[in-house]
Amino acid sequence: MRLREGPTHSFQPPSSVHSSLGSHVYTFSNGTAEADSSSEEEFDVMELRARGGEQQRINASREKVGNVILLERAITEDDNLNKLALQYGCKVSDIKRVNNLITDQDIYALKTIKIPVKVHGLLTERRDELTAFNASAPPEPEKELSLPSMESRDFTVYFKAIDQNIEEAAAQTHDLFNESFALDSPSLPPTRILGQKQPASGADWGIRWWNAVFIMLLVGIVLPVFYIVYFKTQGDSEGTFSIEGRTNVSTSLSPHTNTGHSMEQMTQRTSGFSPGLLQDTHKLLNPGG
């Protein structure tokens, strides 16, 4: 509802603008303009130059619009606005604005979608998914640089000479480094040749796995068997020695035993004789007694 209705007047531009310190003074003429009349003076407005920060924002917005290119991409079943915005580094609002989408579900009514990307960005190089939307002119064929054969040969020889010089310098530097390192550290062992295996010097004492197996077999089987066989042979030899000693003692004592038995028999036989005869017999048997 309109509160007050009054006569409408056309836009009247200022007649002059005066700039002062920190402000602008606009002066208008007192003349009245007809309601139905329209002249070009209504649109002849002086262009005011914006100041520092505003001018930078305007330039940035213009550059932003100029650096954006629209690329077209086919829509699949799994696509949505958030996924496309994250994938191509743009805003959902920009995609909606370019494709005239009102809601997020409107994307499924399209077969292809336009995506705003930077002109010289990495996404513009993905030609397998995106195609230029506003490129009406056919791409210009790449111009092949054709150099004369003599110049190409000269360049080839030149680059080969450079490569050879670099290789020689690298070899000399390597030799000098090895010599200086050998002079600075004479006590260090020589460098290990590639492919040559050196024994380890850790907690395993540098032994191999088959050495460990051999030591376990030696300690667990060979030494116990040798110990048992040795003491068994020692026991057999001691038993044989004791039996032989007993046999020798009995053999050495057998003559004396026989002599004693013969003396007893003679004593029993001569028990009926006289004591003098027995004494004579005893003296004959024991001349030293």
From Swiss-Prot:
Residue intervals on the Extracellular side: 1-208
Membrane topology (UniProt): Single-pass membrane protein
Gene Ontology annotations for the cellular component aspect, listed alphabetically: membrane
Coiled-coil zones: none
Domain LysM: 71-115
Residues bearing glycans: N30, N59, N134, N178
Keywords: Glycoprotein, Membrane, Transmembrane, Transmembrane helix
Chain positions covered by the region annotation Disordered: 1-23, 252-272
UniProt name for this protein: LysM and putative peptidoglycan-binding domain-containing protein 4
